[in-house]
C-alpha cells in the first residue's frame, strides 16, 4: 500500500477456494484451479488450467491438471447450467466444457511443461512464476492435459460444420462468460469506433450472432488444430477417428472422476450420521439419504 491501494488479483473462470484459503494480491490463477492454503508470493499460474495450487511448508506448490481427476470439477461444470434459471438472458454465457479457450490453454501448458523439464531433466522440482512444480506432478500434468485435448478436439469436431464464413482460428477469449475469438471482439470494437454499431442493442446483437454459430466457430478452430498436429488437412476418415478417440478419452476421464466421487461417498465418510440408529444398516440408510446417494 506504499504506492497506493491498488492490488489486483484475478481468478479465472471456475477457480475454487478451500476453507481458509488466502491469496495475497497481486496474483493470477488459471481457469478451474483449486486453491488450498495461504499464498503470498504473487504467483501466476494462468498457463495451467484445471490445476491444484496448495501450500506446503509455506510455499505455493502447483499440480498441473490435477483438477481434471476431481469429481468436484465435474459437479461444478454440470451444476452451473442447471442452476441458470434466468427468464431473461441478457448475458451470453457459454457453459461448454470442451471449448477452444480452455483447450488452447492446455496446448500451451503442454509446451510450457516440456520446456520447463528440458531445462533440467533430472531436477526433482522446478519453479515457474513463483510456484513450485514437482517433477512427478509435471509429468502427470502432461498426460492429463493431452487426454483432455484429445477429448476436447473430438467433441468440437463432432459439433458444428466446416464453413469458410465461420473462421474460428486464432486466439479465443472468455469475455464475461462468453467464449469468442479475439478477432471478432476486435472487429466489434472497430465497428463501434467507426459508428457502424451505434447502440448497446446493436453491440449486444453482434455478440449474440457469434453465440448462435459458436459450434461452427469451435469446429473450425478444432479442425485447424488437428490439421497442424497431422501436418495436413484431415480427411473425413481422420475426422471420424478423432471424434471416436475423443469419445474414448471422455469416457476414461469420466471413469476417473466417478472413482473420485465413490471414494468421497464411501461409508468411511458416514461418521456422525444416524445418531439415533440402532445398527449399521440404519446409519448407512441415513447417510445415503442425507447425501442423496440412493
What feature does the model see in each segment?
Residues 1-118:
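Glycine-rich hexapeptide-repeat left-handed beta-helix
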Residues 83-215, 219:
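Long, charge-rich C-terminal accessory regions
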Residues 4, 14, 20, 30, ...:
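Residue-identity detector for glycine
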Residues 6, 10, 23, 54, ...:
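Extended aliphatic helical segments
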Residues 182-294:
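C-terminal amphipathic alpha-helical interaction region
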Amino acid at each position: 500500500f506504499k504506492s497506493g491501494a491498488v492490488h489486483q488479483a484475478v481468478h479465472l473462470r471456475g477457480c475454487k477456494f478451500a476453507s481458509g484459503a488466502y491469496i495475497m494480491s497481486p496474483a493470477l490463477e488459471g481457469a478451474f484451479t483449486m486453491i488450498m492454503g495461504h499464498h503470498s508470493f504473487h504467483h501466476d499460474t494462468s498457463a495451467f488450467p484445471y490445476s491444484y495450487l496448495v501450500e506446503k511448508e509455506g510455499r505455493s506448490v502447483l499440480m498441473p491438471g490435477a483438477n481434471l481427476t476431481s469429481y468436484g470439477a465435474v459437479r461444478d461444470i454440470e451444476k452451473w447450467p442447471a442452476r441458470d434459471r434466468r427468464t431473461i438472458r441478457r448475458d451470453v454465457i457459454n457453459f461448454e466444457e470442451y471449448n477452444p479457450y480452455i483447450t488452447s490453454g492446455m496446448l500451451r501448458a503442454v509446451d510450457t511443461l516440456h520446456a520447463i523439464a528440458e531445462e533440467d531433466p533430472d531436477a526433482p522440482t522446478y519453479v515457474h512464476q513463483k510456484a513450485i512444480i514437482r517433477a512427478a506432478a509435471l509429468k502427470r500434468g502432461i498426460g492429463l492435459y493431452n487426454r483432455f485435448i484429445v477429448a476436447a478436439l473430438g467433441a468440437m469436431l463432432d459439433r458444428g460444420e466446416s464453413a469458410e464464413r465461420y473462421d474460428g482460428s486464432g486466439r479465443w477469449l472468455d469475455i464475461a462468460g462468453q467464449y469468442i475469438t479475439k478477432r471478432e471482439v476486435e472487429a466489434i470494437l472497430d465497428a463501434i469506433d467507426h459508428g457502424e454499431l451505434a447502440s448497446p442493442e446493436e453491440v449486444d446483437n453482434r455478440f449474440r450472432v457469434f453465440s448462435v454459430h459458436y459450434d461452427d466457430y469451435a469446429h473450425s478452430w478444432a479442425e485447424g488444430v488437428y490439421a497442424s498436429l497431422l501436418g495436413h488437412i484431415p480427411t473425413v476418415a481422420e475426422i471420424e477417428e478423432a471424434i471416436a478417440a475423443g469419445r474414448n478419452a471422455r469416457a476414461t476421464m469420466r471413469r476417473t472422476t466417478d472413482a473420485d466421487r465413490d471414494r468421497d461417498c464411501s461409508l468411511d465418510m458416514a461418521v456422525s450420521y444416524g445418531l439415533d440408529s440402532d445398527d449399521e444398516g440404519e446409519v448407512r440408510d441415513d447417510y445415503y439419504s442425507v447425501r442423496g446417494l440412493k
